[in-house]
């Protein structure tokens, strides 16, 4: 039973399902519910691929997790490193099969993401800013993948991609500030270790500013109406508050950044609903 629990935890199910939700949002913003089967394939593939990525990340991070998160499945012995690796490959395989049933652009995005994910976990995670940028791209690209899966208009989805990527970049930097002790013990060269915690938080704040400035574009381009702005404003206030909080409490700040980014994504859904209603 402990092994089953460990396998589920490796997926980080909340994170995987949330990624599937982002793909759904991207598909809906691009094409509404015009292609339900393609949308379903894309959402399930995203959940599986994200779970696989989380599992392989735990495989490569097992030594760091022994310091930062000793209760994770591999450090506590619930799942062996080899078992986590095989599990990840199996999940990736199913995700690939589902993706091959989608349009070529979705396949191309998925292929790029797979290479980026493997490169992140094995090569770039400990490099200052590079690993953060890859995670930011991967998060934002879930919207692009969803939009490409249904073959819809990607204009608003591209803006959503930029907003999500910038907000995620900020959150990843704040998380590195939070994890600085374990990362330093492991010999990693994350941004806070190289340039300092305070400067890193200012860099994160800069990415939030870019996210906030890009967010009105769907309205300015005539893609969404005023309803979008009404729903968007609280999300932007949340991003600002999260950035401010990160300077005194990185743990709370990065959690608020994640919630605010999701709230901004909901604004895109409501903006789309208002257009088609």
UniProtKB/Swiss-Prot annotation:
A GO cellular-component term linked to this record: plasma membrane
Key words, A-Z: Cell membrane, Lipid biosynthesis, Lipid metabolism, Magnesium, Membrane, Phospholipid biosynthesis, Phospholipid metabolism, Transferase, Transmembrane, Transmembrane helix
Phosphoprotein as UniProt keyword: no
Keyword Cell membrane found: yes
GO biological process: glycerophospholipid biosynthetic process
Pathway(s) where this gene product acts: Membrane lipid metabolism; glycerophospholipid metabolism
Source domain of life: Archaea
Topology class, membrane: Multi-pass membrane protein
GO molecular function: geranylgeranylglycerol-phosphate geranylgeranyltransferase activity; magnesium ion binding
Residues passing through the membrane, by range: 13-33, 40-60, 89-109, 143-163, 199-219, 220-240, 256-276
Cofactor(s) demanded: Mg(2+)
Enzyme Commission numbers on file: 2.5.1.42
Reaction catalysis annotation: sn-3-O-(geranylgeranyl)glycerol 1-phosphate + (2E,6E,10E)-geranylgeranyl diphosphate = 2,3-bis-O-(geranylgeranyl)-sn-glycerol 1-phosphate + diphosphate
Family: Belongs to the UbiA prenyltransferase family. DGGGP synthase subfamily.
Function: Prenyltransferase that catalyzes the transfer of the geranylgeranyl moiety of geranylgeranyl diphosphate (GGPP) to the C2 hydroxyl of (S)-3-O-geranylgeranylglyceryl phosphate (GGGP). This reaction is the second ether-bond-formation step in the biosynthesis of archaeal membrane lipids.
HAMAP family: DGGGP_synth
Protein name, UniProt field: Digeranylgeranylglyceryl phosphate synthase
Species this chain originates from: Natronomonas pharaonis (strain ATCC 35678 / DSM 2160 / CIP 103997 / JCM 8858 / NBRC 14720 / NCIMB 2260 / Gabara)
